[in-house]
């Protein structure tokens, strides 16, 4: 059939004929070229038919070009099966979707083994993903129809898989179902869909949250089969079939961690134990999660009965205003502080960020929890339905309903389009203006400005409604007045402080008395004292939530004593309670930052800067700020002081943003490295200038600073020192410097390096700049402080140990002339790309890992670096793969661990399934390490950690609570250690 005949067959109900909208192209010529290049490889008739459809339906043509330009994932789906694309464009998408599910169900029913089921489901997922995306992009389906289709796809996937597994078990004689065609019926096995899946609101690249329960008296089990092992095995099979990545992709990632106490319970629980748990230990977040719960697979009758039994836990008999503060606290674990004066479009998380989807969901769910016990009509699952019924019952205004509903649908569309780019479960807009410009066009806007204008308006709208809900005292009760100036003899004050959690109420009461009676210089002014008194009650409550409440009070006390002019700051804190909460969080959760603030209170100026909550400054902006800081500095010592102040303020601001959740820990790592790199370059130039003024220059001299370790890989934390190597070169024929005090060759550069180290480590009134570690230089402590380039090259080629070459994978020249930088990089590349014996390298790495375990231990789950399956394992895997494969594929080289893993997976030397474990593991470890390095000076002990710290860790780990986070860490470490042992060997677990 020719292309015109094919096109003529397109009915009005077909997807192509109904395309009503489309993206805007960012680079039309490049997009057209990509599409044309692909069509050039497609059989002529098929290519002509696709081109004909695109030409006759302009929105389709633009959409295909935009996908080629902006969505690697969708373009891969298109290229994988051009005939499938044409079939989708020619058919009715609603009928086609139903037929697709029916075909897949029949194929799974006829499948003989698990591999065949996996193939069927993945083929179904690919076609559905493309069809749904086209219906979304083309404006055929409203966003909630898109979410329902995605949910239907997930529900059918779970049902098909579970039915297949139970049929297999029936064939083995382990269950005796009354209906062999539907063995789940009457089985007592219940699969609850939670969250968005339960409400029919699944997003485009979402995980599916499931909880699996079973009846201890499961009626269909064979007499000799124990329920728990059986249902755990079935649940594990369900998860494996759906989420295992293969050459043809995956179906859905499965998250089973919403079950009761996931750190210590199996993946399938008995209904008896579940009900006991919810009755005794269930928390508000679990009540909120159960609002959307729905029996989606297994024994649906038993599932509905179970939800009925759980209902009294979810829906309280009386108006439950206590849920208001609980839900707000949950929200604060996952999003930024309110009270910010700026929302950065770039890098903003449309789900948990300010004004995002989660605020709308919590706005509805909170009021459902408050009143749903007495008003059963409020017990609806979908967010929009909840807003409708809340308005109908006068819990919210119709204006609030309308504004939040429109905002919700817009933000869900943004979320979907973000995820369509690469099929990643992300909700964050790109970090750069240029990338947001591209995204805006993919989303259908003509410019970033137009998109940002609408987006910010929706954020503001959502924030306004959310903020009003949580204003004031939601219980309507009046707290008994407390005389905070009562001092240590006031028993009422002491009881109050003890009840808040202070271990030394006498000390705190004495300190409070000094504050309230104007005992400090900044509190002598009446207006300042009055403003201060207004927020002392909240301050004391906030500090009581700290890791060490008494120490937090001391830290704030030192801050007050250190302030010379505090009127402006106190007024700001009294008018901006969220900023006060932020300062209290810093003092309570991060003693290191609290001490820094007490010693140098002027670094608080950075918090007042409106840019504080905006996009993180890039290297160019940091360089400009550093230059401005040093612009009018006088003598050398003043330069050093200003550098220290700049470094401490930068560390404080980045650390505070980590704690407040306004920057990701990955962004913080880069920011820490950018700050350090800027300072290193400045110190290098400054010391060079000073040193040359004393000793002159050697002919053709060059010096370079090579960053190793976390600075080299741009993975720094708040406590990272600087691993540096100084490399130099000069005219060997004329080794003497030309200054009045001449030095020769190696002596010149050794003394120069000592001066450089001193600039970093000498303690001034502003402390030290950085601790510097030079032990990664050739021969370590036994070698010279600085290395000549040819000596460095020879050492690396002839003498260096394997561990030194592993370390070299992170080496990065951060301060040098362009010519000298290139020479050093050539040496490093030559060393890293030479052929190596994989077995020898693996053995060396395994021995090193064993030695580290012997020295540091590996049993502490919360030691993110050294625990078995921790970050050291991942680093070693990435470095091992680079050393072994760089000779054949030098493109594998990358200074960061995640970069090296991505390269290895892309080049096929690391299995995609392993990469899918290692990537999120590295991110999780890094996220938690950032927090722990910021907040804990010694080993982290969960049992003694304060509420602030646990809350920040839970947020950083994107977990609902701490037990879930701990379970995730343990599971991740086990998976990483298994990969390490398989790839490298040396099982030291």
From Swiss-Prot:
Lineage top rank: taxon: Bacteria
Catalytic activity reported: [glutamine synthetase]-O(4)-(5'-adenylyl)-L-tyrosine + phosphate = [glutamine synthetase]-L-tyrosine + ADP; [glutamine synthetase]-L-tyrosine + ATP = [glutamine synthetase]-O(4)-(5'-adenylyl)-L-tyrosine + diphosphate
GO CC terms: cytosol
Chain spans, region Adenylyl transferase: 480-989
EC number(s) on file: 2.7.7.89, 2.7.7.42
GO MF: [glutamate-ammonia-ligase] adenylyltransferase activity; [glutamine synthetase]-adenylyl-L-tyrosine phosphorylase activity; ATP binding; magnesium ion binding
Top EC class for this record: transferase
GO biological process: regulation of glutamine family amino acid metabolic process
Cofactor: Mg(2+)
Region (Adenylyl removase) residue spans: 1-474
Keywords, ordered alphabetically: ATP-binding, Magnesium, Multifunctional enzyme, Nucleotide-binding, Nucleotidyltransferase, Transferase
Keyword Transferase: yes
Stored Pfam families: GlnD_UR_UTase, GlnE
Entry's family note: Belongs to the GlnE family.
PANTHER family (alphabetical): BIFUNCTIONAL GLUTAMINE SYNTHETASE ADENYLYLTRANSFERASE_ADENYLYL-REMOVING ENZYME, GLUTAMINE SYNTHETASE ADENYLYLTRANSFERASE
Described function: Involved in the regulation of glutamine synthetase GlnA, a key enzyme in the process to assimilate ammonia. When cellular nitrogen levels are high, the C-terminal adenylyl transferase (AT) inactivates GlnA by covalent transfer of an adenylyl group from ATP to specific tyrosine residue of GlnA, thus reducing its activity. Conversely, when nitrogen levels are low, the N-terminal adenylyl removase (AR) activates GlnA by removing the adenylyl group by phosphorolysis, increasing its activity.
The protein's name in its UniProt record: Bifunctional glutamine synthetase adenylyltransferase/adenylyl-removing enzyme
Species of origin: Rhodopseudomonas palustris (strain BisB5)
């Amino acid at each position: 059939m020719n292309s015109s005949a094919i096109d003529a067959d397109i009915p009005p109900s077909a997807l192509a004929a109904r395309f009503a909208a489309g993206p805007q192209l960012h680079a039309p010529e490049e997009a057209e070229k990509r599409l044309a290049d692909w069509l050039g490889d497609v059989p002529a008739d098929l290519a002509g038919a696709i081109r004909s459809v695109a030409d006759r339906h302009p929105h389709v043509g633009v959409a295909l070009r935009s996908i080629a330009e902006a969505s690697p994932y969708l373009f891969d789906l298109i290229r994988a099966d051009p005939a499938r694309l044409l079939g989708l464009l020619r058919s009715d998408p609603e009928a086609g979707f139903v037929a697709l599910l029916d075909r897949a169900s029949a194929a799974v029913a006829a499948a003989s083994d698990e591999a065949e089921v996996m193939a069927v489901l993945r083929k179904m997922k690919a076609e559905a993903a493309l069809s749904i995306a086209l219906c979304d992009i083309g404006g055929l389906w409203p966003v909630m129809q898109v979410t329902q289709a995605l949910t239907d796809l997930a529900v059918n996937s779970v049902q098909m898989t579970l039915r297949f597994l139970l049929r297999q078990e029936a064939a083995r004689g382990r269950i005796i179902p009354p209906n062999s065609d539907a063995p789940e019926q009457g089985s007592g096995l219940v699969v609850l869909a939670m969250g968005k899946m339960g409400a029919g609101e699944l997003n485009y690249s979402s995980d599916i949250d499931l909880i699996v329960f079973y009846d201890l008296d499961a009626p269909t089990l064979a007499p000799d089969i124990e329920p728990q092992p059986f249902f755990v095995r079935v649940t594990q099979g369900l998860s494996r079939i759906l989420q295992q990545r293969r050459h043809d992709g995956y179906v859905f990632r499965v998250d089973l961690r919403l079950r009761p106490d996931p750190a210590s319970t199996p993946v399938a629980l008995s209904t008896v134990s579940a009900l006991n748990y919810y009755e005794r230990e269930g928390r508000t977040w679990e009540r909120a999660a159960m609002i959307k719960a729905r029996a989606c697979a297994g024994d649906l009758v038993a599932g509905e009965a179970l939800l009925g039994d759980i209902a009294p836990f979810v829906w309280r008999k009386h108006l439950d205003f206590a849920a208001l503060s609980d839900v707000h606290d949950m929200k604060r674990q996952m999003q930024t502080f309110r009270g910010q004066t700026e929302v950065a479009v770039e890098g903003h998380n449309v789900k948990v960020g300010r004004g995002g989807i989660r605020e709308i969901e919590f706005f509805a769910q909170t009021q459902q929890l408050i009143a749903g016990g007495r008003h059963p009509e409020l017990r609806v699952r979908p967010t929009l339905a909840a807003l409708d019924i809340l308005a109908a019952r006068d819990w919210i205004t119709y204006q609030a309903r309308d504004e939040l509903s429109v905002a919700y649908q817009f933000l869900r569309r943004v979320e979907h389009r973000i995820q369509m780019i690469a099929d990643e479960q992300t909700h964050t807009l790109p970090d750069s203006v240029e990338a947001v410009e591209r995204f805006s066009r993919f989303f259908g806007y003509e410019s970033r400005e137009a998109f940002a204008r609408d987006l910010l308006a929706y954020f503001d709208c959502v924030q306004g409604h959310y903020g009003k809900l949580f204003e004031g005292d939601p219980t309507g009760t009046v707290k008994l007045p407390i005389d905070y100036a009562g001092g240590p003899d006031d028993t009422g004050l002491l009881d109050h402080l003890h009840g808040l959690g202070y271990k030394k109420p006498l000390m705190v009461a004495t300190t409070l008395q000094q504050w309230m009676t104007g005992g400090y210089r900044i509190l002598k002014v009446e207006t300042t004292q009055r403003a201060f008194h207004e927020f002392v009650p909240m301050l004391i409550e906030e500090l009581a939530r700290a890791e060490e409440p008494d120490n937090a009070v001391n830290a704030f006390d030192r801050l007050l004593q250190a302030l010379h002019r505090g009127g402006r700051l106190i007024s700001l804190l009294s008018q901006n309670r969220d900023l006060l909460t932020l300062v209290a969080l810093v003092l309570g959760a991060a003693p290191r930052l609290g001490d820094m603030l007490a010693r140098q209170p002027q670094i608080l100026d950075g918090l007042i800067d409106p840019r504080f909550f905006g996009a993180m400054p890039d290297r160019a902006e940091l360089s400009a700020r550093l230059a401005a800081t040093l612009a009018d500095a006088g003598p050398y010592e003043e330069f050093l002081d200003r550098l220290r102040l700049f470094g401490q303020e930068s560390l404080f601001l980045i650390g505070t943003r980590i704690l407040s959740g306004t920057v990701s820990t990955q962004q913080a790592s880069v920011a820490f490295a950018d700050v350090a790199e800027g300072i290193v370059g400045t110190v290098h130039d400054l010391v060079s200038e000073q040193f040359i003024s004393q000793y002159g220059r050697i002919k053709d001299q060059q010096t370079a600073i090579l960053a190793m370790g976390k600075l080299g890989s741009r993975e720094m934390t708040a406590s990272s020192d600087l691993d540096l190597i100084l490399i130099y070169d000069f005219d060997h024929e004329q080794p003497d410097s030309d200054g009045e005090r001449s030095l020769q060759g190696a002596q010149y550069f050794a003394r120069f390096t000592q001066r450089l180290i001193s600039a970093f480590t000498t303690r001034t009134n502003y402390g030290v700049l950085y601790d510097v570690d030079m032990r990664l230089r050739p021969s370590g402590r036994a070698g010279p402080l600085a290395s000549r380039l040819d000596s460095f090259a020879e050492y690396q080629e002839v003498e260096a140990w394997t561990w030194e070459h592993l370390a070299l994978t992170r080496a990065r020249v951060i301060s040098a002339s362009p010519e000298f930088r290139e020479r050093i990089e050539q040496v490093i590349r030559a060393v890293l790309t030479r052929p190596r014996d994989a077995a020898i390298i693996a053995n060396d790495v395994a021995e090193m890992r064993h030695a580290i375990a012997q020295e540091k231990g590996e049993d502490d789950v919360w030691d993110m670096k050294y625990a078995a399956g921790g970050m050291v394992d991942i680093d070693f895997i990435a470095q091992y793969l680079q050393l072994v494969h760089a000779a054949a594929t030098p493109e594998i080289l990358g200074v960061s661990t995640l970069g090296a893993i991505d390269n290895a997976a892309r080049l096929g030397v690391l299995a995609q399934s392993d990469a899918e474990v290692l990537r999120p593991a590295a991110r999780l470890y890094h996220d938690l390490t950032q927090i722990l390095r910021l907040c804990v000076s010694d080993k982290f002990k969960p049992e003694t950690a304060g509420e602030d710290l646990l809350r920040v860790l839970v947020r950083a780990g994107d977990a609902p609570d701490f037990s879930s986070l701990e379970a995730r860490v343990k599971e991740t470490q086990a998976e990483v250690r298994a990969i390490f042992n398989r790839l490298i060997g040396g099982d030291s677990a």
